[in-house]
Amino acid sequence: DMDILKQCQKWHEESKQHKIIDALEAIPAEERTPEMDSELARAYNNLADPHKPTCKEMLKKALALLKPHEEYFEDDYYWNFRMGYSYFYLDQEGRALRYFEKALEVRPGDDDTKEFIERCKKGISLPQFWECFRERTEDWWETFAEMEAELRQMMDEDKDHTRGAELVAQMQ
């Protein structure tokens, strides 16, 4: 496992994200370690070009690889940064912010993380809409649809109505 991760690091330094993706996607998902999924997500994040139609798909793939490992990587700088990065470039600054703040907590003073936090706060207070209203609405509806079952379960389980803040945080 360490050999493949070392090789991925080398490819990353050489900007060979496709090699990382090919190598790690060749390993069945159930055999990949959380670290491998994190490296694969990093490669998808780095390949996501905002000027290409595949951008959102790449970022969503990265999130799908990272999300299952939330408990495992809870206090990991890279995992939190990668989650924030994916959400940020999916124009979900509200969601991105909490991951960048956690990353900064783990690595205080990190300039890249501080820069993203500022950009998130600016995006939240002064949103710049690069897409038309219809596209933004469709994207948010798609995001909501993906999360609806999880949200409904949270509401159903919240018999004493104490998880409101948690529900709101999930939708930011």
Residue ranges and their predicted role:
Residues 2-29, 45-54:
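Alpha-helical segment of the N-proximal tetratricopeptide repeat
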Residues 17, 50-52, 59, 93, ...:
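TPR-repeat structural position
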Residues 29-30, 72, 106:
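Structural marker of alpha-solenoid helical repeat scaffolds
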Residues 46-55, 91-95, 120-143:
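Alpha-helical linker/edge segments of TPR/alpha-solenoid repeat scaffolds
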